[in-house]
Regions:
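Short glycine-enriched, charge-decorated loop/helix-capping segments at active-site entrances
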Residues: 6-15, 84-86, 115
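Amphipathic, non-transmembrane alpha-helical scaffold segments
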Residues: 17, 21, 42, 46, ...
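Short catalytic helix/loop segments, enriched in acidic residues and glycine
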Residues: 9-28
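Phosphate-coordination/substrate-recognition cap region in phosphate-metabolizing enzymes
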Residues: 25-99, 154-178
Length: 193
């Protein structure tokens, strides 16, 4: 979502707004307080997530770690809503239907992805690329998007299809996870209270 213009951004590729840059700097400061040395940053193929990641790395003074970009971590594709103003969408299709498309697990906008379909590309990538690094005791940052992260959190936290509609991930709000040797979540904490 493009906050500046209240647009469904999806796969469109704008940069960060000044608010987005400030949120990334704040997120970096919060992550820096953990005192963790990171091994790798995973991000999407979209510039706003890449910029968020590089701003965070600068804030934690770890600019030299490996950065891996992959479209599997891209935001959800919004189809016919892509690039449209949220209020215009509500006028055209009705507020309730637009809200259902945004939050539902199995219903998506016309021509767009459902959250389930977003997860169908995010989770294999996580399991094939990110999870093995975690199992090697590496510290990873993932700088991605609201819906790609919702898909990942649904898996990690075992959130039901029904409860995922309530999960909201604020922009610029880092979440710290620790995993045991079996890859199960043993600790989770939002760094923004």
């Amino acid at each position: 979502m493009c906050i500046r213009d209240s647009l469904f951004t999806g796969w469109e590729n704008p940069g960060l707004t000044e608010i987005g840059k400030a949120e990334a700097e704040n997120a970096g400061d919060l992550i820096n307080n953990l005192g963790i040395g990171f091994d790798c940053l995973f991000t999407s193929a979209l510039i706003r997530a890449q910029l968020t990641g590089t701003i965070i790395l600068k804030a934690i003074n770890q600019n030299n770690i490996k950065i891996i970009e992959n479209k599997a971590l891209n935001e959800r594709f919004y189809g016919d809503l892509q690039g449209m103003n949220k209020d215009e969408c509500k006028q055209k299709w009705g507020e309730e239907l637009v809200q259902t498309w945004r939050r539902s697990y199995e219903l998506g906008p016309p021509g767009g992805e459902t959250l389930k379909e977003t997860g169908d590309r995010v989770l294999p990538y996580y399991l094939d690329e990110i999870h093995p690094m975690l199992m090697q005791d590496m510290n990873i940052i993932v700088a991605a998007h609201g819906n790609s992260l919702r898909s990942l959190i649904k898996y990690l936290d075992k959130v039901s299809d029904e409860d995922i509609v309530k999960l909201e991930i604020p922009t610029g709000a880092p979440i710290h996870y620790l995993f045991n040797e079996d890859g199960k979540v043993m600790y989770k904490k939002s760094l923004i209270e």
